[in-house]
């Protein structure tokens, strides 16, 4: 089967050169404030963080707040917890419908990193660029909203409200909320020495979308055309788009099946940044060591040809709606990786063992010469509808 036709601006009576990504100067989750700056900015919110919780709950219920992507707040009644997250990104692909799906998947991913599989409600946050013409706005933004809505329904939830504003750049995001019993989520702080690290989506999305834009910029394309073909770039771009739009819900469910000890999702801080943040949260004195980097095919070579300007080999390259990084018992990890590929979960799910958890000081690192796992594109075997009403 072949991939369905991608977004064509002329099909919507727009100029053939219309590009959604031109309505922002940053891409995807590359908008994040650096981690060290963020921690300093949030210090005042962390003061007396647990006092109220301890007053009425005796600190019995688990709680998670400032410093992680999801908050877990014990409710006053019934032994339940509110699990909530918010996120937003800028356009990273030019297909408005797929961009809506990616934005929704990106919001939900923080819940999935907690092992939460059911979302009770979503809000959508939308910034409509004041640089869009009325025609562009009226053609493009409904596609974005439809993509967001369809992804939320795939996740078993719905969008019941939100906020829409005029903004210089297009902004896409939302809020995901659920109420859980203690056995319905997994706190991200129980990694132990001997665990292994599993990743559920390949790295390199930022590289793929960047070099796809370089196809129209000769001075940039000429720097990399000796290491990658136009077909390679097109396949990597399609694969990146499908991976970003794929929900991490299956992986979240399997975290319970295979006794996951901790997890986070990989987004704007890159795999190393998010691994470091997760390591800091651990109750046991451990460190994470990453030996393998699964990367979209040809994107490692592109990164090296660019002088590693993307930071891909160093683990600092931002990802958008990336996979889950999961700490699993060694004896369970291989079974997790095999199970997630089962056809019963649909096409496209993958996982790799990429490192280990060892005794340490709550840090994370990538070894000097990590093994690069070239992840071949699966788009040629998938029948994916990237635009409402498109036909194969």
From Swiss-Prot:
The active site is at residue 31. SUPFAM superfamilies: PurM C-terminal domain-like, PurM N-terminal domain-like. The modification Phosphothreonine is found at residue 387. InterPro entries: PurM-like_C_dom, PurM-like_C_sf, PurM-like_N, PurM-like_N_sf, SPS/SelD. GO terms for biological process: selenocysteine biosynthetic process. It is an enzyme of class 2 (transferase). It comes from the Eukaryota. Keywords: ATP-binding, Cell membrane, Kinase, Magnesium, Membrane, Metal-binding, Nucleotide-binding, Nucleus, Phosphoprotein, Selenium, Transferase. Synthesizes selenophosphate from selenide and ATP. Belongs to the selenophosphate synthase 1 family. Class II subfamily. This is Selenide, water dikinase 1. The lineage of its organism: Eukaryota, Metazoa, Chordata, Craniata, Vertebrata. The gene is sephs1.
């Amino acid at each position: 089967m072949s991939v369905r036709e991608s977004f064509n601006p002329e099909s919507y009576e727009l100029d053939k050169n219309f590009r959604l990504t031109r309505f922002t100067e940053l891409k995807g989750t590359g908008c994040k404030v650096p981690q060290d700056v963020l921690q300093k900015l949030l210090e005042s919110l962390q003061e007396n963080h647990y006092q109220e919780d301890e007053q009425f709950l005796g600190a019995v219920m688990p709680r998670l707040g400032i410093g992680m992507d999801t908050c877990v707040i014990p409710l006053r009644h019934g032994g339940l917890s509110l699990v909530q997250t918010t996120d937003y990104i800028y356009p990273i692909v030019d297909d408005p419908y797929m961009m809506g799906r990616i934005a929704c998947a990106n919001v939900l991913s923080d819940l999935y990193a907690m092992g939460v599989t059911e979302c009770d409600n979503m809000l959508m946050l939308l910034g409509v660029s004041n640089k869009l013409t009325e025609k562009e706005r009226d053609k493009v933004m409904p596609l974005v909203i439809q993509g967001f809505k369809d992804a939320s329904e795939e996740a078993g939830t719905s969008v019941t409200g939100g906020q829409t504003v005029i903004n210089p750049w297009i902004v896409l995001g939302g809020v995901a909320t659920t109420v859980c019993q203690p056995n319905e989520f997994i706190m991200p702080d129980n990694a132990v020495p001997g665990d292994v690290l599993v990743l559920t989506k390949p790295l390199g999305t930022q590289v793929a979308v960047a070099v796809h834009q370089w196809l129209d910029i000769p001075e940039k394309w000429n720097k990399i055309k000796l290491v990658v073909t136009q077909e390679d770039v097109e396949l990597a771009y399609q694969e990146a788009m499908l991976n970003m739009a794929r929900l991490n819900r299956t992986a979240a469910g399997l975290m319970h099946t295979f006794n996951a000890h901790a997890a986070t999702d990989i987004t704007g801080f890159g795999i190393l940044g998010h691994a470091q943040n997760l390591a800091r949260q651990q109750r046991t004195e451990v460190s994470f060591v990453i030996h393998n980097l699964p990367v979209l095919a040809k994107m490692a070579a592109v990164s090296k040809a660019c002088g590693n300007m993307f930071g891909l080999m160093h683990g600092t390259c931002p990802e958008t709606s990336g996979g889950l990084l999961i700490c699993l018992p060694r004896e369970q990890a291989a079974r997790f990786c095999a199970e997630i590929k089962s056809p019963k979960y649909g096409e496209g799910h993958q996982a790799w063992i990429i490192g280990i958890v060892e005794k340490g000081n709550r840090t994370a690192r990538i070894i000097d010469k990590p093994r690069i796992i070239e992840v071949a594109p699966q788009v040629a075997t998938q029948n994916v509808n990237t635009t409402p009403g498109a036909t194969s």
